[in-house]
Amino acid sequence: MQYNQDGDTYIIYVEQNEPIMETLTQFCKDHNIMNAQVSGIGAIKDIELGAYDLDNQEYIKELYSDIWELTSYQGNVLLKDDEPFIHAHINISDHSLSGRGGHLFEAKVAAVGEFILRKINTDGKREFDPNIGLACMALN
């Protein structure tokens, strides 16, 4: 992983075969980033993608091992159990330009992983909401 910083904005290059979520989470821990917005593009593989089933309060997961274009990565960083936690959704495209999208659990960089992280100076966190079954934003 490589990065450059300009104030509260970081340009982060996640390198080939590095796990995206693990790498970005560790970056936040190492740089004391507790709240942020993250976006990115690239080419990824070994993707664990999900969609939340609210009725059953569980994720329906799919694995994609092939190489896919990462056409959009959007996420946020908030504290969960006193640690930076990234919640991210992605859109991906295969070689026939067919797409998929959903909640990203993890993926590895296949070719490039180019991300912009903008630190936000707030005290947002995640707290468990029993009606949803997830740790949701708590901004009070």
Regions inferred by a protein language model and the residue ranges of each:
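N-terminal intrinsically disordered, cationic/polar leader segments
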Residues: M1-H87, N91-N140
